[in-house]
Amino acid sequence: MRIVIAIITGLLLFLGAWLFNQESSNNDTEVKQEQTTVDTTAWIIDVTANLDGERIVNADDEPGNWLAHGRTYDEQRFSPLDQITTDNVGDLGLAWYFDTGTDRGLEASPIVVDGIMYTSGSWSVVFANDARTGELIWQFDPKVPKAWGVNACCDVVNRGVSVWKGRVYVGTIDGRLIALDAATGEVAWDVNTIDKTKPYTITGAPRIINDKVIIGNGGAEYGVRGYVTAYDTATGEQVWRFYTVPGNPSEPFESPAMKDAAKTWTGRWWTMGGGGTVWDSMAYDPDLNYLYIGVGNGSPWNQNIRSPGGGDNLFLSSVVALNPDTGDYIWHYQTTPGDTWDYTATQHMILAELEIGGELRKVIMQAPKNGFFYVLDRVTGEFISAEEYIPMTWATHVDPESGRPVESDNARYQVANPLLDLPLKEQVAVLAAMTAEEIEAAYHKPGPLGGHNWHPMSYSPDTGYVYIPALDMPFGYGNEPEFTYEQGRWNLANDWRLGMPTGDQGVDDKVDGLLRGFISAWDPVVQKEVWRIQHAGTWNGGMLSTHGNLIFQGNSSGQFVAYRADTGEELWSAPAQTGVIAPPISFEIDGEQYVTVVAGWGGAFALTAAAAEGYNLKPRGRILTYKLEGKVELPPVVDIAAVLPEPPPIDATDEEIKHGKFMYHKYCGVCHGPGVRSGGVLPDLRYMASGKHIVFEDIVLGGILQDRGMVSFASSLTKEDSRAVHQYVISEAHRLKSRSGN
């Protein structure tokens, strides 16, 4: 019998390796060009060659285009177009759709230049389409090695490209910055922006200022040091680099700003990176020539480990103003001093001029993760005002004199949860006796996904409102017992047990019901919510405002929706057949206004928590474009119902399964979902076929699926750990089968 099993196992290993190697990635790039006429190529060259800063600064002179990430340098995401209005938006229909061929999250904001649309998909693939018809002009695949995906905390997403003087610029998930010919997709240059021995990623869209393409990176969950870099758009040569947190103080500081920042840190933070990655938001004021960057969380999250003597830990969780020509520091404002909750300030920033106290002020507005909506003077960095836009427990208010948050008594999580010392059955009994409100009160708010995540807000100068795609999600923070830093793994120093489902359906349903998402229409002058649209789901899309008194947003329920901008009344919706998380844009061709959104379920919530909402949304990657009287229909969805295979018998003690549950949530849950409940992006391990169970150890420790992104965890897990994880997964498969019947 052992010989038979050995033969079967060997055959499965051989077949698995052969099959997966057929789709393995390499570092070679690939351009797919469709047949285009000489006239089309010449047209693209003509309309993109003169796309520069002057055109973006004067974008309102050509409102039919969407020339930059937020349409304009001020990132308001407001379209002056008004052919589509509250009166006729009900006549909106699909003009065209384009299948991206991707099955991971899509977060990009497209660029449209005189009828040519440029956007990006998962794995940093770039598409050029005819914006009138959706016809593909060219497609570029940077061939990111799939194994690099393990370094991406929050899916292998990309938030868009930039176009400048005949070239398209994209950052890749493996840390490269690439310039492409806008007409052909051919590579002009390709530079590495990171230390490849460290788990950096790029998911944010580049910004271009004064012939410099500026890019940040991510990776603070793993243990890296953040920075933002400017490269020459023509040559790809590095012009400057600004580090956001200090390095080893025994070595020369890169700038006076780093020397000053180091005074706000303690301990040996640099051995764990420190964090502070600039993974998303930037804005630019051309009159001041100030670049604004949003800086992320500490690495590890827990300040007790990162900087045990406390301190503000600059420039974590800060808005920083830089000179875009030199990278020199100008000013900063820190939203969360001494961050210990993953309260990044990388969220969308909007520039505007507001009348405050009878004076017209140049302001920068942000709703970062920490739950306060900030209005700052963008000339000086002076604090103007802040009010909470979601319920929170970590702080009571922001002191108007100092501009610093006033932390509540239980803000920092030194005290361990007493429930963790009880056996699981007793934990369940205590929680089952509590109401949902009592359970919610025991958590911290907001959680690490924040009151607002990366999804862009929008601002309407017509209504004066900022539209926030907000989140209300509690979370359990606590010191991780015996934390040890692990290179290339998640290093939070937060107790993973606090986020583990109990396995009791009633208790877990109560906790799942605490996750909420909504649109908040916010008046930034009086710092007050005007109205709110409560969503059925939590993880919803970015915002678009238009001069037609409309706002548009996709949602996690798989709908793309238009609302009145002044009142929030829903006026129109269309099925997207997948969750929508990207922000819409609007443009005009030949006198017709279009609205486009890139649709594809994914991202951090989809990986880690989406199963809680019960949606069975697949990441069907598409570009969806609408216009008045559009007549195109999406093809019907054909979903094959998943059948739960008969799981192998459980072969472990309760103590082994308990250990497997802990190790699963520490190393596996961030991708495959808490409680082995997938959010629809990556495989639900409860549904593993029998062959996968046979080679489970070869997958987890041997890395036979590395070319598909499932790398070996042999550096973190022993054979006993792997077996315990496997038994926990099997136990959850049995639990599901007994509950559902199949």
Model region roles, listed by residue range:
Residues 661, 673-705, 711-712:
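Gly/Gly-Pro-rich "capping" loops immediately C-terminal to redox-active cysteine motifs
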Residues 338-340, 345-348, 390-394, 445-447, ...:
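Conserved blade-ending motifs and adjacent loop-strand segments that build the rim/top face
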Residues 44, 54, 639-663:
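Electrostatic cytochrome c docking/interface patches
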Residues 215-226, 266, 293-313, 473-512, ...:
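Short, conserved, GDST-rich strand-edge loop motifs in beta-rich repeat architectures
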Residues 585-641:
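Blade-level signature of beta-propeller repeat domains, shared across WD40, Kelch, NHL, RCC1
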